[in-house]
Amino acid sequence: MRNSNPGTGTVRTVVHEGDGLKISHVRQPDARVLVFSFTERGNFELAGDGFGGDFLLGNGFDVVAIKSARSSWFEEVAPVLPRIHAALDQAAVRYDLRVCYGSSMGGHGAMRYAAALGANRVIAISPLFDIRDPADTRYAEDIRLLTSDPMIRADGFSPDCDYVVLYDPRGPDAPHVARFGAVVAPGRLRPVRLPYSGHPSGYFLAQTGLLKPVVEALIRGGALPKLRGPAVARRRSSVYLYCLADGCLRANKPGWAAALLDTALDRAPRDAELLALKSRALTGLRDWDGAEAAARAAMAADAGNGHRQMLLVDVLTARGALPAALAVLDKMIGEAPGVGHYAWLRQEVAARISAAAGVQPQYWAT
């Protein structure tokens, strides 16, 4: 299907649509750079011009937007690669440069298919090598959507392509980048390390105003903007402050963590992740009132999230407010009666209450 925008010279062609995958080629007059963009995980919107589409087109680049409505890590792209090549052959545009671009799941797709798409350069933000890695279970729920084939093949990388990877070297993405380094040709992997930028690092770059200039510079082959600016610039990013606070907490410095989180919450007062981490920091300081208040605020900001409810149970249990913890668990069990862990934990809390009262606990089947 072909759709032209009168007055702009932009032509949109649907290359493939089906089974939750849509691929579109967007052409503009005189464009010499083609960017294959891969949508991020959780963005199931198949309409529009894809990941970063407005930005890419606004800078004069043509786009092949690869959009997936499934968290299948773009496994469904492999069978339709011939259609992409056929569409580009039919368009008969001689591009000087082909770039693959994506973040997280999209970064994985960019790395995985760059060679097959004839890309000269990859810009991958926080790409994962394999979600089956038992040491990293962040996306284990997506494994059921995969085939038995390897997610990454060692022979799937071009020695003529530069693979630029932006990531947090202090986070769980670092081992994935190391695995990419083992299969990319020597000298072709260009890591851009962004400490305390989290996953994916694009949020940090966006919050500091660096995402667009960095991506544009990488596409055009120019020098990168300064990525390690003054502390005041980094502190504009709640992601940076969260990751730095998490690092402080892991280093047993809860006071530092709490101070950093106060700064972050000044900018995002209802951010559930920030509130939850602050509750943990205040628990480390044994500030029980503050820890409980932060946990309740996190639960209110992210209603229905069992992790937030469990945090409140943990705080109440730690401060010895066992009847209050039991009341929260009763509410959780009423909302999700099939979660066996909740019933088990309720028995444990009830047993502690009974023991404190000198009463023999009663157990029942659940």
Provide a role label for each language-model segment.
Residues 135-203:
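The feature captures the conserved acid-bearing segment of alpha/beta-hydrolase catalytic domains
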Residues 235, 268-270, 303, 337-338:
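Short coil turns that delineate tetratricopeptide repeat
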